[in-house]
Amino acid sequence: MRMLEKGKLIVASHNAGKLREFDGLIGPFGFEVSSVAALGLPEPDETGTTFEENAYIKALAAAKATGFPALSDDSGLMVDALDGEPGVYTANWAETEDGKRDFDMAMQKVENLLQEKGATTPDKRKARFVSVICLAWPDGEAEYFRGEVEGTLVWPPRGNIGFGYDPVFLPDGYGKTFGEMTAEEKHGWKPGDASALSHRARAFKLFAEKALNVVSAPAE
């Protein structure tokens, strides 16, 4: 495992919601953080067929363009009744004809498909969020960290705090959707903690432990 040394770190994302979450997760570690959005760098075409491939495409492009290590996330919603869709195409399902993204439309699309399949009870609406974080260096070397969280899709959407599909995702064991949770509730992790809730926080926890050598408390 290649360790990440303190210094400048590029977050390879133009997604405002992801950038807010990364800012909260990376903040305690003392890196000089910038994003490809702030630097005006273009988004590479995500031509991969897995979360790992797309995360690498984004992180490597940012690392090569800036000369600094870059951190990216490729994430998505996988719905059991839809054979794992939308998966790596989660963001694509929200694309409109004018090139923008409408996640209200995307959530409705998922719900329509579930209704068509008769998936109206919680046991038929199981899903998971997946996040793969890629840390890439300008020389092309990379490390990967994967996090997943299981849950159930609810309808109608609940809450407007999060982004993307958060308002319809109810994580197992909780009474709030991600869209109803504060950032602290959703991520449920800070350096040294034993556990994390969200898929991105779980992936980031692995990144912190393996690439930054952060020691977490043992899980109870």
From Swiss-Prot:
Protein name: dITP/XTP pyrophosphatase
Record keywords: Hydrolase, Magnesium, Metal-binding, Nucleotide metabolism, Nucleotide-binding
PANTHER family according to UniProt: INOSINE TRIPHOSPHATE PYROPHOSPHATASE, INOSINE TRIPHOSPHATE PYROPHOSPHATASE/HAM1 PROTEIN
GO molecular function: dITP diphosphatase activity; ITP diphosphatase activity; metal ion binding; nucleotide binding; ribonucleoside triphosphate phosphatase activity; XTP diphosphatase activity
Cofactor note: Binds 1 Mg(2+) ion per subunit.
Keyword hit for Metal-binding: yes
EC number(s) recorded for this UniProt protein: 3.6.1.66
Family matches, as NCBIfam families: RdgB/HAM1 family non-canonical purine NTP pyrophosphatase (TIGR00042)
Lineage: Bacteria, Pseudomonadati, Pseudomonadota, Alphaproteobacteria, Hyphomicrobiales
Co-factor requirement: Mg(2+)
Species whose genome carries this gene: Brucella melitensis biotype 1 (strain ATCC 23456 / CCUG 17765 / NCTC 10094 / 16M)
Annotated function: Pyrophosphatase that catalyzes the hydrolysis of nucleoside triphosphates to their monophosphate derivatives, with a high preference for the non-canonical purine nucleotides XTP (xanthosine triphosphate), dITP (deoxyinosine triphosphate) and ITP. Seems to function as a house-cleaning enzyme that removes non-canonical purine nucleotides from the nucleotide pool, thus preventing their incorporation into DNA/RNA and avoiding chromosomal lesions.
The family this protein is said to belong to: Belongs to the HAM1 NTPase family.
Binding, Mg(2+): 45, 74
